[in-house]
Regions:
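NAD(P)-dependent dehydrogenase/reductase Rossmann-like domain
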Residues: 176-177, 216, 255, 271, ...
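Small/polar (Gly/Ser/Thr/Ala-rich) solvent-exposed segments
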Residues: 265
Length: 313
């Protein structure tokens, strides 16, 4: 029996039209989206299908939209996968989708949590503006050193998303992030790309959001996951509800340790493990191939993707 690891994408993967074809072809996907609409109290699925784009990309909408897409795919393929799930992992907000896949949280509850998460992150970003930038072609250790130097005046610049061996996202106060980017270029970075975000995610600037999110997480009806979920903050498997709550709150101010998470997932899966990315796009599949070059990975985002996968299963 093939060991399966589920992968769930994070913010940035949203686009107008997302999951529309899934809802039209698969009743399980439509039912998942309808249930999330009812829980949130507004037609998120309409925003996903038809836009407008500026509203869909707002943090408080983009986060539940991506989770809705991932969980709609899982509702279709999860029960039909021939293989034992050994782990799940999600990038940033995708960690919530991973807990849904592991049976620790209903999709509707997770959507409400990430909607709240997005609102709190947006608020924190308004109260203390921050920014993020992707550093390409430079080792993480060099990026971290540049951030330490840029932060020496008291402003914040940190390595926030450790996405690949030579792809790191930095986060913090705008001036410090700009300085860190310049220092990264001086150290040999190929490119530094500013990101269009509403705050300094995964940095200490998100502390007010993390504190309030912790309250919402404590009230959420978590169960122990049926299989381990690899936490962004530690890159270690989580097997109980209490630890899941704590680490999801910690996640807002901690780096996303994606390289280490994928290495740990590969260890849990063992030789021949199959990784399945569920949700919009295929970014995580691309990152995985750079981290674990011999990994077998499939991305399921569209109705055609899902249909082909089910035919071959």
């Amino acid at each position: 029996m093939v060991a399966t690891v589920w992968l769930c994408p994070g913010q940035g993967a949203q686009k107008v039209g997302m999951a529309k074809d899934l809802a039209e072809r698969f009743p399980e996907a439509r039912a998942t989206l309808d249930a999330i609409d009812r829980t949130l109290g507004f037609p998120l699925s309409t925003l996903m299908f038809d836009g407008p784009e500026d509203q869909l990309t707002a943090t408080e909408n983009a986060q539940p939209a991506i989770l809705a897409h991932s969980t709609a795919v899982f509702a279709v393929v999860g029960p039909r996968v021939d293989g034992a799930a050994v782990a799940a992992a999600g990038h940033s907000l995708g960690e919530y989708s991973a807990y849904v896949a592991a049976g620790a949280l209903p999709a509707t509850d997770a959507a409400a949590l990430v909607r709240r998460r997005g609102e709190l992150m947006q608020k924190a970003g308004t109260e203390r503006p921050g920014t993020m930038a992707a550093v390409l072609g430079l080792a993480t250790a060099e990026v971290e050193a540049a951030c330490r130097e840029a932060s020496s005046s008291g402003a914040v610049a940190v390595a926030a998303n450790l996405n690949g061996p030579d792809q790191t996202v930095i986060s913090g106060d705008p001036d410090a992030v700009r300085k860190a980017g310049e220092l990264c270029k001086a150290r040999g970075a190929k490119r530094v790309v500013p990101l269009n975000v509403s705050g300094a995610f995964h940095s200490s600037l998100m502390a007010p959001a993390a504190n309030q999110l912790r309250v919402a997480l404590e009230r959420a009806a978590f169960r122990d996951p049926a299989f381990p979920v690899i936490a962004n903050a530690t890159a270690e498997p989580v097997r109980d509800a209490g630890r899941a709550r704590r680490l999801l709150a910690d996640q807002l101010t901690a780096p996303v340790r994606w390289v280490a998470s994928m290495q740990r997932a590969a260890e849990l899966g063992g030789a021949g493990a199959r990784f399945i990315e569920i949700g919009p796009g295929n970014v995580l599949a691309g990152l995985l191939r750079r981290i674990v070059p011999d990994a077998s990975v499939t991305s399921l985002g569209t109705a055609d993707d899902v249909a082909r996968f089910l035919e071959a299963a």
